Amino acid sequence: MAKTVAYFYDPDVGNFHYGTGHPMKPHRLSLTHSLVLHYGLYKKMIVFKPYQASQHDMCRFHSEDYIDFLQRVSPNNMQGFTKSLNAFNVGDDCPVFPGLFEFCSRYTGASLQGATLLNNKNCDIAINWAGGLHHAKKFEASGFCYVNDIVIGILELLKYHPRVLYIDIDIHHGDGVQEAFYLTDRVMTVSFHKYGNYFFPGTGDMYEVGAESGRYYCLNVPLRDGIDDQSYRHLFQPVIKQVIDFYQPTCIVLQCGADSLGCDRLGCFNLSIRGHGECVQYVKSFNIPLLVLGGGGYTVRNVARCWTYETSLLVDETISEELPYSEYFEYFAPDFTLHPDVSTRIENQNSRQYLDQIRQTVFESLKMLNHAPSVQIHDVPSDILNYERTDEPDPEERGGEDNYSRPEASNEFYDGDHDNDKESDVEI
């Protein structure tokens, strides 16, 4: 039976800009959406311009002081916030930029709305490529992430779902999500990531397994440089099958960070776009309600290819290898294809022996789980999106609902190997 797929896209979200030289480029979302449109994939989905999350929504996970700071700080007044900037880890990796709070509101609102639609059985799969910012902590920003839309989305899912499984295939450990649910068996977190050699964020060892009620409900799969499709598949599929068999989640959240692809500007893995997509296809095959989110990914043209391809898999549509003509067509030079060779010369340091050892350790850990922990019956709170908004300024003062619209920053288009945002790699 065909699945109902909800797709969230805010036309302004790609116009925010972290600043000159910063590797995180929201413009990748505009490129992705352009390909989704020109391939005609939007016809297979219900397309939403998402809800914008309020302070109240964000404070379901984050501290009020931190969210209040995000709403008030701007490039013009940040000199007066020196103490707060340090306290909340806002600075180099997580800079203050124009429209910062609104950017967070847009990507978080989409994840929250996706969770609500899944709760109400209005869709089987919800996609928010702008979300997946898995490093943000309760009291601070981290790793280009300010508000943890994943945690907020999962908290909404937990109103209706006794058990939520979180899977993370970003090259970086999903530390913010793990930390949020470390003490509970209501959420099981499974992260496949590069670990060792001081690679950010430095967490995600195999022996981080959860604590108290959450003991053994946290699973980490630490990987070494250069992992390829075959090696990744050798671990991913059996681990996920075992987790789903044991835990029996009623909903899955999948973070699809594309920095695990070969040729990523900040990555050191060797996955192809097909190999990355195979993970998405495999998780989808279990026919469990699914919230699909973006995440990392710093070679912009390949991020757009990857998430477009994965959108096609989620809607069961075969799309052409030749990219459709769009306003960003020249950006995909020189091959203009969906699946260019993204392999690198990085040696695969994940030997079969190492992978088997990890697999064995993971399976031993799973044996410690209670099968499908149950939840006491409780009243279901009203949907978060029905809450009365008391923290919004008057629309007249704001200048209308869509007051913040910025032109595309030209340096969003730069992402070459030696890119420093001073010279474009592509003629636009």
Swiss-Prot record:
GO terms for biological process: circadian regulation of gene expression; epigenetic regulation of gene expression; negative regulation of transcription by RNA polymerase II; regulation of circadian rhythm. It comes from the Eukaryota. Pfam families: Hist_deacetyl. GO terms for molecular function: chromatin binding; histone deacetylase activity; histone deacetylase activity, hydrolytic mechanism; histone decrotonylase activity; metal ion binding; protein de-2-hydroxyisobutyrylase activity; protein decrotonylase activity; protein lysine deacetylase activity. Its EC number is 3.5.1.98, 3.5.1.-. One of its GO terms (cellular component) is chromosome. InterPro entries: HDAC_PDAC (IPR050284), His_deacetylse (IPR000286), His_deacetylse_1 (IPR003084), His_deacetylse_dom (IPR023801), His_deacetylse_dom_sf (IPR037138), Ureohydrolase_dom_sf (IPR023696). Zn(2+) binds at residues 170, 172, 259. It catalyses: N(6)-acetyl-L-lysyl-[histone] + H2O = L-lysyl-[histone] + acetate; N(6)-acetyl-L-lysyl-[protein] + H2O = L-lysyl-[protein] + acetate; N(6)-(2E)-butenoyl-L-lysyl-[protein] + H2O = (2E)-2-butenoate + L-lysyl-[protein]; N(6)-(2-hydroxyisobutanoyl)-L-lysyl-[protein] + H2O = 2-hydroxy-2-methylpropanoate + L-lysyl-[protein]. It is an enzyme of class 3 (hydrolase). Inositol tetraphosphate (1D-myo-inositol 1,4,5,6-tetrakisphosphate) promotes the histone deacetylase activity by acting as an intermolecular glue between hdac3 and N-Cor repressor complex components. Residues 3-316 are annotated as: Histone deacetylase. Keywords: Biological rhythms, Chromatin regulator, Chromosome, Cytoplasm, Hydrolase, Metal-binding, Nucleus, Repressor, Transcription, Transcription regulation, Zinc. 1D-myo-inositol 1,4,5,6-tetrakisphosphate binds at residues 17, 21, 25, 265. Residues 380-428 are annotated as: Disordered. The active site is at residue 135. Histone deacetylase that catalyzes the deacetylation of lysine residues on the N-terminal part of the core histones (H2A, H2B, H3 and H4), and some other non-histone substrates. Histone deacetylation gives a tag for epigenetic repression and plays an important role in transcriptional regulation, cell cycle progression and developmental events. Histone deacetylases act via the formation of large multiprotein complexes, such as N-Cor repressor complex, which activate the histone deacetylase activity. This is Histone deacetylase 3. The gene is hdac3.
